[in-house]
Design a protein with these regions (language model features):
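Bacterial Sec-dependent N-terminal signal peptides
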Residues: 1-28, 292
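A non-transmembrane, solvent-exposed segment enriched in polar/low-complexity residues
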Residues: 20-181
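Short, small/polar residue-rich loop motifs at catalytic or cofactor-binding pockets
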Residues: 48-49, 260, 284
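N-terminal targeting signals for export/organelle localization
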Residues: 76, 88-91, 104, 112, ...
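Short amphipathic alpha-helical coiled-coil/interface segments
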Residues: 139, 143, 175-193, 197, ...
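Conserved hydrophobic/aromatic pocket- or pore-lining residues that grip, position, or stack substrates
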Residues: 209, 264, 288
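N-terminal "domain-start" segment that seeds a small globular fold
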Residues: 243-278
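Short active-site neighborhood of thiol/selenol oxidoreductases, capturing the structured segment around
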Residues: 275-293
């Protein structure tokens, strides 16, 4: 049974790495004053490239195109007045997983999210027809309560410890309690994400989530990184996306929790080249802070 599942995941991953035969066909319906506004899709590169564009007419739009594989894209509705230079300040925007399938969009021009975050914009684009997007939304729902609790604890830490500390009022005991609470919630979110990756190793959503672990903002051990690498390698093989992931994983292992520090060469205040190990006292805990310019 295990071998059968491995073969199935491998087939799905190969389909991802290879070009798909079908194109995407998006039809949309937007409520509110939107006549003549431009709707476009941007890829996830830097700088992002526009892959398709159309104009909203009678509250509707339609566009067709083809992508090599499912991936994370951005939709934009440009509300810049006619005759004015387009500006991100006038964009409505959101991200989703695009695939070559028939997809529908529905939204309200008055409530859709803006390019720059606006807490008053609480609406969302309703997207149907992309199985990859459905899986992504399912994953977000699975960690929604944990994420909500984490954000709440973070807000409490800000109000009860951080801001008072700016006035030299240190609620240390409460700060420690909340810091531990945040750390525990982070641990649970990491574990839930790892479970999702292991349950869906052939999905680009899982590969993307694993990739986010390697950005340096989430603390993983070298063993956890190795485990993720092995899970994904079994179904992604030498696909370019997997090759890129492996390279980042090897770099991440060097700065993972428990890994020996990199004994890099530095310049001391006198301009002399020294090894990092020469600057560290023995038998003590040392906090290092690096600034780049």
């Amino acid at each position: 049974m295990k071998n059968l599942l491995t073969v199935l995941f491998l087939v799905l991953a190969i389909q991802y790495c290879q070009a798909q035969n079908k194109s995407f066909h998006i039809t949309g319906s937007i409520q509110g004053p939107c006549e003549g506004m431009v709707f476009k899709l941007l890829d996830n590169s830097y700088p992002p490239q526009t892959i398709a564009t159309t104009v909203i007419k009678d509250h509707c739009f339609e566009l067709t195109g083809e992508i090599p594989a499912p991936g994370f894209y951005r939709w934009i509705i440009d509300t810049t007045p006619v005759g004015k230079k387009s500006s991100e300040a006038n964009w409505l925007a959101g991200n989703f997983y695009l695939e070559n399938s028939d997809i529908t969009f529905q939204g309200d021009i008055h409530t859709l999210p803006t390019y720059y975050w606006n807490p008053e914009r609480k609406g969302k684009m309703i997207i149907q027809g992309s199985e990859t997007e459905d899986l992504y939304q399912s994953f977000k729902t699975s960690i929604q309560e944990l994420s909500k609790a984490r954000n709440q604890a973070d807000g409490e830490y800000l109000e009860q410890y951080h801001r008072p500390a700016l006035d030299n009022i240190f609620n240390t005991e409460e700060g420690i309690r909340l810091a531990r609470r945040i750390s525990e919630l982070d641990r649970q979110i990491i574990q839930a994400t790892i479970r999702f990756i292991k349950q869906n190793p052939a999905s680009v959503v899982a590969l993307d989530q694993a990739g986010y672990f390697l950005l340096g903002e989430i603390d993983l051990t070298s063993g956890q990184i190795e485990d993720l690498q092995n899970t994904l390698s079994g179904v992604w093989g030498n696909c370019p996306r997997m090759t890129e992931f492996k390279e980042k994983a090897e770099m991440a292992k060097k700065i993972a929790i428990g890994a020996p520090f990199q004994d890099i060469e530095l310049t001391d205040p006198e301009g002399k080249k020294v090894k990092l190990s020469e600057c560290l006292p023995t038998g003590k805990y040392v906090m290092l802070e690096f600034w780049a310019s």
